[in-house]
């Protein structure tokens, strides 16, 4: 079950790796990997094997804002490009 929330309040859910649905963003598990999507197809964060990864590619001002709102603060995050992020999923 996914928790309904807003983008501005979803950061703690992302950090705790809880499935959620917000304004054009979603957090869900794909197998054992936690993925945060923008518009259900563009991955912005992936948590795999104890490590956070962030998409370093710029897509749109909206996606950049979502990334800022959802970034799990205080975590070590490796920035990779979109294809590398998709390969992790």
Region locations from a protein language model:
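Terminal leader/tail segments of proteins
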Residues: 1-89
